[in-house]
Amino acid sequence: MKKKAIISACLLGLDCRYDGGNNYVGDEKIKKLKENYELIPVCPEAYGGLTTPRVPSEIAGDKVVSRLGVDVTHEFGKGADAALYLAKLFDCDCAILKANSPSCGSGTVYDGTFSGTLTEGYGVTARLLTENGIRVIDENEI
């Protein structure tokens, strides 16, 4: 029986990015992942009630704010809770998440200035999963 992993839906080609697009990682990476894992797609931002497309958001201090200055911390937290629920429901030991995202970034995220600058940190979902013992990697580590 294969292990199970949640994966950012945008990495599988689902159009759920903030701009309505996706971050498809390509057939070779997906094939490699499917050799070892049953993949469960998740989009924490959609699960949190945010629309697609949506105004970009970044982590600023202890909050997540949109480029328009709207506090969307609650929505990001709700989406993270949903992703954790699914990871536990399917007994996932790994999560493959979108690099640099305010939800899914693992190690680096955008710094909250909307200038494209990266800083050390974890997205809301990546942090919650890690705190609950689920290993998080990004698409660059496949």
Q: What is the predicted role of each segment?
A:
Residues N23-V65:
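Short, surface-exposed acidic-centric catalytic microdomains
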Residues G20-N23, Y110-G116:
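Short glycine-enriched, charge-decorated loop/helix-capping segments at active-site entrances
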Residues K98-T113:
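Internal, conserved structured core segments that host functional sites
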Residues Y47, P56-L86, T117-I142:
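Divalent-metal-activated hydrolytic enzyme cores
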